């Protein structure tokens, strides 16, 4: 039976007991409102550890001034049930007061320069500072041997890898493949905001990513690939934040050849969707 913890001392006691037994612990950080993509992170975490701890915390420091923290769906009972079915051993459910004892406005914040300041960082200033701040605290609280993050949030994964390397956290960071519906739409908590009419239109993001890959393989210029992708999304009714081709390190490519990642962020109505494709 899955264990739930609301108090840090009790969680640390259980983790210490596991570690005395020589067991490896993996962490799966989440903000709740979980779906099959999140459950796949737990399944993957089991390959890297003997015990899996998931955290559920809607983090106020990663919400911008125009992003409604209070409206983010909170479904803890369903989330815990789903995590148990996925094979999770424990769930950490901290309060805002426990995570930020000095208050959100006065808390010490983390910043990962460079990679956190482009793309999502440019569209959502301060977002990755909030992500780094909460993830660093979760690492210190849980002290996992491994932590699993979805590749759907490609830039977030890159930011966390940079923070872990620079601060020498002794934690293995694992990226989990994107989980998609049968029509290609990446699973996301935001998909529930799409109307019945918008839902089939949203699949054009994945088709556009595939088109960007085809353009790259065919030798098209980066400028042409990005322009065509933006035009295709706009034709389907999207407001495009970015549709870009980058190196795996999220730098602008300066030469042909090598791996690439295509990244898209676009708004359909009021719903902002992100996706990416590595090739």
UniProtKB/Swiss-Prot annotation:
Where (R)-pantoate binds, per the record, is at 62, 156
Principal location class: cytoplasm
Q: Name one GO cellular component term.
A: cytosol
* Compartment annotation: Cytoplasm
What binding partners and quaternary form does the record give? Homodimer.
The record lists beta-alanine as bound by 62
**What GO terms in the biological process aspect are recorded for it?**
pantothenate biosynthetic process
Pathway membership: Cofactor biosynthesis; (R)-pantothenate biosynthesis; (R)-pantothenate from (R)-pantoate and beta-alanine: step 1/1
Known function: Catalyzes the condensation of pantoate with beta-alanine in an ATP-dependent reaction via a pantoyl-adenylate intermediate.
Please give the name of this protein.
Pantothenate synthetase
- Which reaction(s) does the protein catalyse, per the Swiss-Prot or TrEMBL entry? (R)-pantoate + beta-alanine + ATP = (R)-pantothenate + AMP + diphosphate + H(+)
- HAMAP family, sorted: PanC
Question: Which GO terms fall under molecular function for this chain's record?
Answer: ATP binding; pantoate-beta-alanine ligase activity
Name the family the entry cites: Belongs to the pantothenate synthetase family.
Q: Which PANTHER family match?
A: CYTIDYLATE KINASE/PANTOATE-BETA-ALANINE LIGASE, PANTOATE--BETA-ALANINE LIGASE
Which gene is this protein's source?
panC
Amino-acid positions noted as binding ATP in the UniProt annotation, renumbered to this chain: 31-38, 150-153, 179, 187-190
This protein's UniProt keywords: ATP-binding, Cytoplasm, Ligase, Nucleotide-binding, Pantothenate biosynthesis
Residues in the active site? 38 (proton donor)
Q: Which InterPro entries does the record associate with it?
A: Pantoate_ligase, Pantoate_ligase_C, Rossmann-like_a/b/a_fold
EC number(s) stated in the UniProt entry for this protein: 6.3.2.1
């Amino acid at each position: 039976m899955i264990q739930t913890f609301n108090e840090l001392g009790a969680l640390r006691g259980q983790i210490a007991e596991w570690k005395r037994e020589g067991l490896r612990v993996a962490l799966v950080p989440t903000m709740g409102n979980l779906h099959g993509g999140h459950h796949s992170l737990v399944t993957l975490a089991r390959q890297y550890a003997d015990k899996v701890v998931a955290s559920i915390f809607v983090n106020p420091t990663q919400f911008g001034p125009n992003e409604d923290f209070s409206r983010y769906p909170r479904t803890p009972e369903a989330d815990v049930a789903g995590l148990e079915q996925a094979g999770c051993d424990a769930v950490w459910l901290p309060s805002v007061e426990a995570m930020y004892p000095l208050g959100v406005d006065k808390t010490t914040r983390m910043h990962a320069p460079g990679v956190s300041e482009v793309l999502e960082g440019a569209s959502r200033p301060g977002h990755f500072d909030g992500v780094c701040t909460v993830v660093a605290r979760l690492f210190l609280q849980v002290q996992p041997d491994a932590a699993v993050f979805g590749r759907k949030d490609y830039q977030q994964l890159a930011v966390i890898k940079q923070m872990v390397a620079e601060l020498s956290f002794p934690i293995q960071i694992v990226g989990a493949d994107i989980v998609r519906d049968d029509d290609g739409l990446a699973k996301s908590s935001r998909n529930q905001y799409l109307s019945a009419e918008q839902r089939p239109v949203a699949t054009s993001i994945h088709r556009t990513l595939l088109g960007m890959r085809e353009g790259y393989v065919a030798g098209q210029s980066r400028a042409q690939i990005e322009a065509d992708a933006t035009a295709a999304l706009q034709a389907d009714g999207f407001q495009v934040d970015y549709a870009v081709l980058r190196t795996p390190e999220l730098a602008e490519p300066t030469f042909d050849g090598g791996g690439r990642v295509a990244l898209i962020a676009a708004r359909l109505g009021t719903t902002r969707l992100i996706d990416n494709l590595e090739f």
